Amino acid sequence: MSRAGTWLKMLGVGIVICVGGPALVEKLRPTDAELIQRYNPELRERSMREGDRRAQEFDDYVTKLKEWSKSDKSIWFAAKEMEEKRLAEQQAIQNQTKEQARIQREEMRKELMGEK
């Protein structure tokens, strides 16, 4: 076989692999609807219930990743800083709630002592 024939044969094989492989995968892979039909009824119901919430959580996560990737730092460091910031805010809210409860208790004591 000539050199050109070998090249044409290899080109044909390459095209079959590059086009046929993904086409075969698409044909064999089930659609989302087919997968959901295979679920048992409990899983199907739970999937329908929690689907919107999970989609929203994923969208929020992707948004955070985009925000973290804008900084010059590694995504891991940016995520850690965001987590530390969230924990600090949570701690501040908790401290504020404790302080309000303490002030309320003191006011109640003063009222009780004034009434006696």
Curated annotation (Swiss-Prot):
Localization, UniProt: Mitochondrion inner membrane
GO annotations of cellular component type: mitochondrial inner membrane; mitochondrial membrane
Keywords, comma-separated and alphabetical: Chaperone, Coiled coil, Membrane, Mitochondrion, Mitochondrion inner membrane, Transmembrane, Transmembrane helix
UniProt entry tagged with the keyword Transmembrane: yes
Biased composition (Basic and acidic residues): 99-116
Biological process according to GO: mitochondrial respiratory chain complex III assembly
InterPro entries, alphabetized: Cbp4
Residues covered by region (Disordered): 90-116
Coiled-coil stretches noted in the UniProt entry, renumbered to this chain: 77-116
Membrane-protein topology: Single-pass membrane protein
Transmembrane segments: 7-25
Family: Belongs to the CBP4 family.
Role according to the record: Essential for the assembly of ubiquinol-cytochrome c reductase. It has a direct effect on the correct occurrence of the Rieske protein, core 4, core 5 and apocytochrome b.
Name listed for the protein in its UniProt record: Assembly factor cbp4
Species name: Emericella nidulans (strain FGSC A4 / ATCC 38163 / CBS 112.46 / NRRL 194 / M139)
Gene from which this protein is expressed: cbp4
